[in-house]
Every structure is written in C-alpha cells, then in structure tokens.
Regions:
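Alpha-helical "hinge/linker" immediately C-terminal to small N-terminal DNA-binding modules
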Residues: 1-31
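C-terminal effector-binding regulatory domain of bacterial HTH transcription factors
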Residues: 10, 59-63, 187-196, 205-242
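Short loop or secondary-structure boundary microenvironments that flank
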Residues: 12, 43, 162, 217-220
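All-alpha effector-binding/dimerization core of bacterial HTH-type transcriptional repressors
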Residues: 32-37, 41-43, 48-56, 107, ...
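Central regulatory/effector-binding core of bacterial HTH transcription factors
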Residues: 35-97
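Short, well-ordered beta-strand segments
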Residues: 36-40, 85, 134, 183, ...
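Residue-level signal for inorganic ion chemistry
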Residues: 39, 199, 230
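C-terminal regulatory
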Residues: 79-81, 91-213, 240-242
C-alpha cells in the first residue's frame, strides 16, 4: 500500500466503524445481535470465566462471533482493534471504563503429592529457594514473573528458579499436576485438583489476594450492542459478577 493509500485508509476507518456500528444497532433493535466482538485477555481468564459466558452467548446470540485473543502481552486495545480487554484492574489504564467480571481471588502455591514426597514440603517462604519452582515469562517484557506472597502480614516479592519456564499459567498448572515442581496459580483454577487431591496447597498463609478480573473498554457516547450483550450475559452467568 502506498503512503497516500495508508493515509486515506486511516481517514475513512472511523467512518466505516460508525457505519458498522449503526448496522449492528439496527439489527439489535430487531432483537438480533450480530457482528464480531474482539476481546484481548489472558489465557487464565478463558478458563476462569469466559467459557461459560461464551457457551451462553452462542445459544442466545447465534449471529454474534466472539474472537478471544489470549496473550500475556498487555496491548493497546484501541490501536489493535479490540472492542474490549480483560485484565487485573491494576493493569488497566485509568481512562478506560471498567466492569467487574470476577470476584477477588487468591494466587496460591501448589504441587503434587509425588513432587512433595520426593522433595519435601516447604514450611517457610525461604524454603522455596531449595525447590523446583515453575517460572512464568511475561510476554511484554520477557522478564520472569516474581511471585507476590505475604510474609508475616506484609507483601513480599520472591525470585524463584527451576527447570521449567512457561508463558501461561495453565501450562504451569499442568506441569505441577505432572509432578515437575511448584506452581503459582489462581486458586479457582486449582480448586478442582485440590478437592480431588491431585494437588496440595502450600504455605496457605502466604497467599496473595487479587481484586479480580475486570472487563474494560474505551469511553464512548453509547455502548455497542455486541458489547452490551456480552456484559448482560456475563452478569447472569457468573455468580461472582458484580
């Protein structure tokens, strides 16, 4: 594309977006929600919250397509063409509109009984330095995530090391289930495995609580029908939705 063509496209894109939104509003008035809803989020959110929402949306709005881009990297959702994003509140820009998607949750340390039988069970945070901790590489910076824990009622950041590095919390959970090492995961993801006894919760007094996941989107004069449909279904589907 020539430079002139790129300038022309940049100039008409807002108008085209307005036309698409007007068409979507017209069909919504007829009781149909259509179009493509693009959401950027973390893979962990898909497993924590989005699956039941998507299942309900498919039944209620069969002409609405939802594209989920699961990525560790925090992107500019407007520049990248997303309708909305889902992240921890602290990662969201202040000029965005936010709506709570999940309740608060704890980030916990888990390991399998096989691993603990072979390596022992840590009793203190300092003991983690002697264990195989499954690392998480952050997408945007490439840095290794430092575990956020509570030590004697004060927040601490712990650097860990181990034989495995992943780019996704679900991968860390899978490795913990396989007996590879200790993983730092959201408690809702591990709940079933804790109940079954496949995993054990380590150092429970050190678990950090996060404020939950929030849907966010740019401020507009009015909310697009497809995004409104998503929010309405989320409210009815998730018990923790506020």
């Amino acid at each position: 594309m020539t430079e002139a063509g790129a300038r022309f496209l940049a100039g008409v894109e807002p108008a085209l977006a307005d036309i698409h939104e007007a068409i979507e509003r017209l069909t919504a008035e007829r009781g149909e929600v259509t179009g493509l809803l693009r959401i950027n989020t973390l893979r962990v959110v898909l497993d924590m919250a989005l699956i039941p929402i998507l299942a309900t949306l498919a039944g209620q709005h069969p002409r609405l397509t939802v594209e989920i881009n699961a990525d560790q990297t925090l992107v500019d959702i407007v520049a990248q063409g997303f309708d909305a994003g889902i992240r921890l509140r602290r990662a969201i820009r202040q000029d965005m509109v936010t709506t709570r998607l999940t309740g608060s949750f704890k980030a916990i340390l888990v390991a399998s009984r096989d691993y603990l039988d072979a390596r022992g069970t840590p009793k203190l945070i300092a003991d983690l330095q002697q264990h195989n901790c499954i690392g998480l590489r952050l997408g945007e910076s490439g840095a290794i995530f430092e575990w956020e824990l509570i030590d004697r009622k004060k927040p601490v950041v712990v650097k860990t090391s181990g034989t495995a590095l992943v780019t996704d919390t679900m991968q860390a959970l899978s490795l913990a289930l396989a007996g590879v090492g200790i993983a730092y995961v959201a408690e809702p993801l591990a709940r079933r495995y804790l109940r079954e006894g496949s995993l054990e919760w380590l150092l429970p007094q050190s678990a950090t609580e996060y404020d939950g996941m929030f849907l966010y989107y740019p401020k507009r004069a009015s909310l697009a029908p497809k995004l409104r449909a998503f929010i309405d279904v989320a409210k009815k589907t998730l018990k923790s939705f506020e």
